[in-house]
């Protein structure tokens, strides 16, 4: 008969459990005195044996599950397996059998070891790839931060507005303009270059001024006209005389200066002062009502219609447009017959002849020679 103890366990099983417990205590004491002892392997074997005893006591010896003990590889076996793994990760059956004979291991254990070793290798490769990606991301963020720091100073340098904008706004005319003026556009540079050209051209006609002094008074045209040509053969056109009184008294003042060559010098000085004041206040060589322009004496640019849109006075601009309508047709017709303004073909006799013709059209019969 089988004797049952507490909780249905047999007395033999109870005695076996007590014996295994005592064996485990002895093994623990031996592990404390012997540092070379490996408790993990021995503890696993004790646990396996304890499990076998419990299963045998519970189900009997017929129903005991077959369990395989964990294989403990030696250093020589691991070295041989690692060398083979470095050569190939997937050894064939012949290579596995030879390796099993060399290491004194079953061929199934060698096959399982290679399977586990491949899994470990793949895991290590994934971890290395993650580390490389992390380093690349860190390097990319550092590079982006460095680029941002390098790009930051030019943005700050562009932030303050240019002082030219404020100066251009203050120098704009106060009255309503017929033409929009952009300070930063090439129109301003063209106007400034035009002003410099007029100042440079003041020195050019000095030799012509001497000839004009000998010939008599200069060719007087309407000083308010936007375009003029002193040497035009159409200057003695009878259509000129009706347009002269429409310049609001400016022609009368200019006729008073036309009596002697000394007045020509005064007009030259007055024109220089007028051009200097105009260039300082406005950025165009524009006309002004304060002083009559003496541009006809200098023989400068023929077409001065571009700065008319920036004149500060509207009634004066209307008189200019009227004069322009009167002067446009004869000037355009006469421009085709002359090669250039400063051509050397003009002589003193031609100048005297044209001066007399113009004086006759103005009503001045007696002129000093």
From Swiss-Prot:
Gene3D superfamilies: Homeodomain-like. InterPro entries: DMBX_homeobox, HD, Homeobox_CS, Homeodomain-like_sf, OAR_dom. Residues 194-203 have a biased composition (Acidic residues). GO terms for cellular component: nucleus. Residues 124-253 are annotated as: Disordered. GO terms for biological process: midbrain development; regulation of cell cycle; regulation of mitotic cell cycle; regulation of neural retina development; regulation of neurogenesis; regulation of transcription by RNA polymerase II; retina development in camera-type eye. PROSITE patterns: HOMEOBOX_1 (PS00027), HOMEOBOX_2 (PS50071), OAR (PS50803). A motif (OAR) lies at residues 346-359. One of its GO terms (molecular function) is DNA-binding transcription factor activity, RNA polymerase II-specific. CDD domains: homeodomain. It comes from the Eukaryota. Belongs to the paired homeobox family. This is Diencephalon/mesencephalon homeobox protein 1-B. The lineage of its organism: Eukaryota, Metazoa, Chordata, Craniata, Vertebrata. The gene is dmbx1b.
